Amino acid sequence: MRKITAPDLPATGLLDTHDRQREGVITERPPLAYPVALRALASCAATTARLLRQRRIHLPAGHVGTRLRFADGTSARVYRETVVDRGATKDPCVLVVEFRLRAVRGWGHAAFRWESLLNTPLFVGFPGFVSKLWLANDERGRYRGLYEWDGPRRAEDYARALWRVLALVSVPGSIHYTVLPGLRRDEVLARPPAMAGTAAADVPEWWRLTKVS
C-alpha cells in the first residue's frame, strides 16, 4: 500500500474531500482550528450524555491487562476498554493516537489512569466511534489509544479535534496519530502483521503493532 499524504492546507475546518480515504495509511495533519474543535467537542459531549442515558457505553474487561508491543521496540499494557452499542461498521479503520504528558512521573501515571475515565465524553460521542483500548505509558512515557472507527475521515476529524485538548497537558511535539483504513481492531489484535506494509518506509512506526501477549 502507498502512503497517503495531504496538501498543505490551513487547519480551518473538518476534511471536505474523499481523496485521502483511499487504501493506505493516513498520516497526520495539523489540529483543527480552535472554534471548529470546540464545536466538535461540545457536540460529542452532548451525544455522550444521550448514550449514557441509553446505557449504550460499556467497559468490558476482556482485553484489560493485555500487553501490546510496537515496531519501535516499546510496549504498553491495556488498562481500560470502552465500547459503544451501535449498528454494523460499514467502513472500518484503526486509529492510533500517542502523546506524552508533561511533568507526570511515578505515581502520577497511576493517578492519570484513574482520572482518565472522566475524559470519556471527549471521544465516545464522536460520529463513527466503535471502540477504544486505553494503553498505559510505555518505556518512553508515551500513552497510546488504539481505536476502531467507522470511517477514516471521521477518525481523523476526531484526532484533529482531540489534539487541541491533549496539547493542554502534553509535551510539545509528542502528539501524533495514524489512521489505517480497511482494518478492524480485532483483526490487528489477532493478527498484528495485518498492519505491516501499510506505510511508506519514511513513516515512523510507533503505531505498528507487532505482538499481543
Question: At which residue positions do the language-model features occur?
Answer:
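Short S/T/G/P-rich N-terminal loop/turn motif that feeds into the first structured element of a domain
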Residues: 2-126, 181-213
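Short, well-ordered beta-strand segments in beta-rich or mixed alpha/beta enzyme
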Residues: 94-99, 131-161
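Amphipathic alpha-helical interaction segments
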Residues: 123-126, 156, 169
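A general secondary-structure junction signal
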Residues: 136-138, 179-183
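Short, non-transmembrane amphipathic alpha-helical segments
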Residues: 162-166
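Conserved short beta-strand edge segments in small beta-sheet-based binding/regulatory domains
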Residues: 167-181
